[in-house]
């Protein structure tokens, strides 16, 4: 069902040994086209060289592979400029061999050339493989740039099982984030802000708890558990293709916390920036804690008049934001976001009244959706 509802991705091979199908998939999806492999030094050795071998075996014409040689590569605009220049010199269809950074870089650069691409996944590390859009840091800000999802995906569980444990943990964290993200959509649905669309909701949430049920097996590299994890991550992207209005089906407040950490150049004690999945895991814990407090709140006891009267005006919030981020890389960015998403006092009053009048329904749905902080950690 998920692939049937996808608007861009037409082919998915997921399972053990499916790397052998890469030539057939390319020929079926891009008949008569040349291929150019895009990888970094690590993913070239993990799968890129094998992909090149299979393409040659199957008679697929190829250009010289483009291999980023940085020891540590992040999704930054300087790499977009470099790959743009490479792809502009050929009409070949790119095959991204990698995970988050390689995929998003290739995705956006292919869109700049107005051509499709495919991806060979090397880790179950994040949910963005088949998402429409690429998360790239530009001018100090983590931004999502609109661009089509891959037309084809090959995800070999045997290759994914060889990824570093931290990458699998990152993917598990990104998938777990769908739990509070679903709760956010429930709240938006009850408030009448954004009604739940049952198709993308079911794509993401239908098998979510089962996919999360055995983290120990994922850690051990168990093929069945890893395939369930990879499938769950792919489903998040398919849901976003089926719901082009926003990333609502697969992300919520926890992803906003991830973006904030990126924009603040947050690093761990070892000086390294945490992966996207680890960042949203931090956001997930924050969101789950918030929901624990919300579920303990009696909304019938709220003094709505007092709360609305204390609500800062748009200008007050923008002024506070400009002061807060004055010395950052993005002094005006947050103020722009506030202006785009500001709720008026009238809207805020209506939201509080709905939460008061429908709190039993809201809390029942949230309890069914959520896990506790203790369960999460």
Where are these regions (language model features)?
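Short beta-strand/turn micro-motifs composed of small residues
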Residues: 38-39, 98, 155
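Active-site segments that bind and position negatively charged phosphate/pyrophosphate groups
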Residues: 201-359, 366-373
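A short, small-residue-rich loop immediately preceding and capping a beta-strand
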Residues: 87-109, 113-123
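ATP/NTP phosphate-donor binding region
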Residues: 1-93
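Solvent-exposed alpha-helices and their adjacent loops that cap or buttress functional pockets
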Residues: 4-6, 29-30, 86-89, 110, ...
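A glycine/threonine-rich phosphate-anchoring loop and its flanking beta-alpha core
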Residues: 111-210
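Residues that form or flank phosphate/diphosphate-binding pockets in enzymes
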Residues: 46, 104, 163
